[in-house]
């Protein structure tokens, strides 16, 4: 077993492509896609669970694939997935965090851009070419799922470079519950983000099932009693294969179109989405200011790790 980049943990020898990878054909092109391997519970992962809020039970054995949708034609920040942060392209930091978790048999970047694909290949990051017509990241994940077999697929945002390996254990722990078909993460919402429509809020049932996601401030503190339990949604999703296929086959739903939140398609169609507590917040990079903040954080991490 060889260690993945940036990880002291043993990784599958096929997590990164090598010259003898046979590859799979996606989008009409041969790509270096690792074959899923069997994994179970790893004791060192148990130590990374956030604040004891989740227990990563042994989930039998699952094939788990991580997919990082990465569009180059971003509208708010041009070419953002390839923007350099602390010496690496943004998408590489995301891939390294996911790989370092040790929970996924393979982590693949899914893109419709040959330029993104070329950068990934140069850095030994598995890549799949997907259709330019994919309307959402989940559709891009489904396209990969049709070629890369797994039991669970993790949809990882390619524009969150401050993500760490510790975000994945609480998410995957939810799948120890057989009723969980789809899962995501949330974190305590900082006071300055409560009224920010770009910080999506989520409210859940007592069992962790999402009741609603909104750009509005939910719940509404009618009596102004000083409610502090607002939760911010983090855009990492995991699906069992059947749930992913079901979700991606559905047309956009009315509330999804109003709020511009694709996860509402699940709720409106009666597909339960369970929410785990993340160990912290991340920076979704949409502006030059976000990019600078991410640069500072990643350079601080590098200095700390090398110190």
Q: Where do the protein language model's features map onto the residues?
A:
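N-terminal glycine-rich phosphate-binding loop and ensuing alpha1 helix
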Residues: 55, 61-110
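Short terminal hydrophobic/aromatic SLiMs and anchors at protein ends
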Residues: 21, 25, 32-34, 47
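Residue-level detector of structural "landmarks"
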Residues: 3-11
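Conserved alpha/beta core of the MobA/IspD/sugar-nucleotide pyrophosphorylase nucleotidyltransferase superfamily
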Residues: 228-305
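Short phosphate-binding loop-to-helix
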Residues: 108, 114-173
């Amino acid at each position: 077993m060889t260690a993945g980049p940036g990880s002291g943990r043993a990784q599958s020898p096929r997590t990164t492509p090598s010259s003898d990878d046979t590859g799979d054909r996606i989008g009409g092109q041969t790509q270096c896609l690792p074959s899923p391997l069997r994994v179970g519970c790893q004791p060192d992962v148990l130590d990374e669970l956030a604040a004891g809020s989740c227990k990563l039970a042994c989930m039998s054995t699952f094939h788990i694939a991580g997919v990082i949708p990465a569009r180059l034609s971003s509208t708010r920040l041009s070419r953002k997935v390839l923007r350099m942060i602390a010496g690496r392209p943004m998408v590489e930091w995301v891939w390294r965090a996911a790989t370092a978790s040790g929970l996924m048999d393979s982590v693949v970047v899914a893109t419709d851009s040959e330029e993104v694909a070329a950068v990934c290949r140069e850095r030994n990051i598995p890549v799949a070419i997907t259709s330019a017509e994919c309307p959402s990241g989940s559709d891009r994940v489904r396209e990969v799922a049709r070629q890369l077999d797994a039991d669970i697929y993790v949809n990882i945002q390619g524009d969150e470079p401050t993500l760490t390996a510790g975000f994945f254990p609480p998410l995957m722990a939810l799948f120890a519950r057989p009723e969980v078909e789809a899962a995501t993460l949330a974190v305590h919402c900082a006071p300055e983000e409560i009224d920010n429509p770009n910080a999506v809020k989520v409210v859940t049932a007592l069992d962790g099932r999402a009741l609603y996601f909104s750009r509005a401030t939910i719940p509404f503190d009618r009596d102004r009693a000083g409610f502090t339990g607002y939760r911010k949604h983090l855009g990492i999703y995991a699906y069992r294969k059947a749930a992913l296929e079901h979700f991606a086959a559905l047309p956009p739903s009315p509330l999804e179109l109003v709020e511009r939140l694709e996860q509402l398609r699940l709720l409106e169609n009666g597909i339960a989405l369970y929410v785990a507590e993340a160990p912290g917040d991340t920076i979704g990079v949409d502006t030059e200011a976000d990019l600078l903040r991410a640069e500072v954080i990643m350079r601080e991490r590098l200095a700390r790790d090398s110190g």
